[in-house]
């Protein structure tokens, strides 16, 4: 075989890395919707996760997170890598997530849905937040605690009481909307947060904001927004829904 010369070039687009749960059927599609291909390069790894999301399966994810980070392309230099689990971050700890990812992949910044949600709420200058979660109380409650530790007030929280991730991915958008209306009716709120990256939320955000006259945030929406902000991407080039999509982060 004759050797032929070639040239090497680097793609100038920002690289984003996403570590999704093995059972998550929603986040990857949502991210490809929010980040059109010309805007950034998106690389996705998966972390093993049980069919049920419980404190025990989340603890196991902490052990598997380093290997999931190492499965991202090792030659790539990422602007941001995110761990895509809201409840996982609340139980493992955002600081620990950052530590594990930085130790196992090359990236300027690390994000997660809990940190992203707090940054988004601060950017929107809201303090009283209602939460809708698909999970049982032992998985959902630490998210509330994470918000409260960031000096946010959570007047009310609703959950679907679900443990099986395959069912979470199939919760009807109409049910999500009904829960958002219910939590808004039960307390004075500045915003609503729809928790869980496996919940199908992007499509309902514009309608809910119009009906409730409140900012409506969700795990995938805030994570995409936060990653874009950390990577220096212009929000006008993305498709982040709702009021948040027009708001720059205060980093």
Placement of each model-derived feature along the sequence:
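N-terminal glycine-rich anion-binding loop in soluble enzyme alpha/beta folds
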Residues: 1-70, 132-172
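Glycine/small-residue-rich loop that forms an oxyanion/phosphate-binding "nest" at active or ligand-binding sites
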Residues: 68-115
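Short, well-structured alpha-helical segments in soluble
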Residues: 62-76, 175-189
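Short, acidic/small-residue loops that bind anionic groups at enzyme active sites
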Residues: 98-121, 208-223, 227
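Hydrophobic alpha-helical
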Residues: 178-211, 223-224
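Periplasmic-binding protein-like
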Residues: 78-84, 130-131, 189-196
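C-terminal functional extensions of proteins
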Residues: 218-251
């Amino acid at each position: 075989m004759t050797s032929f010369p070639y040239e090497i070039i680097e793609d100038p687009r920002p690289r984003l890395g996403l570590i999704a749960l093995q059972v998550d059927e929603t986040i990857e599609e949502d991210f490809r919707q929010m980040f059109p291909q010309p805007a950034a390069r998106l690389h996705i790894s998966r972390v093993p996760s049980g069919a049920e999301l419980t404190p025990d399966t989340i603890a196991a994810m902490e052990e598997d997170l380093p290997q999931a980070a190492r499965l991202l392309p090792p030659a790539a230099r990422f602007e941001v890598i995110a761990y895509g689990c809201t409840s996982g971050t609340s139980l493992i700890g955002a600081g620990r997530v950052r530590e594990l990812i930085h130790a196992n992949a090359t990236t300027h910044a690390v994000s997660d849905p809990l940190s992203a949600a707090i940054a988004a709420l601060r950017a929107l200058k809201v303090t009283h937040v209602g939460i809708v979660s698909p999970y049982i109380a032992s998985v959902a409650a630490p998210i509330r605690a994470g918000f409260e530790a960031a000096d946010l007030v959570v007047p009310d929280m609703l959950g679907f009481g679900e443990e099986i991730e395959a069912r979470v991915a199939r919760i009807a958008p109409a049910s999500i909307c009904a829960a958002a209306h219910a939590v808004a009716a039960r307390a004075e709120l500045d915003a609503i947060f729809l928790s869980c990256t496996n919940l199908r939320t992007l499509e309902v955000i514009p309608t809910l904001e119009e009906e409730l006259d409140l900012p409506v945030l969700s795990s995938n929406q805030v994570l995409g927004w936060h990653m874009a902000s950390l990577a220096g991407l212009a929000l006008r080039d993305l498709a982040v829904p709702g009021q948040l999509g027009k708001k720059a982060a205060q980093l």
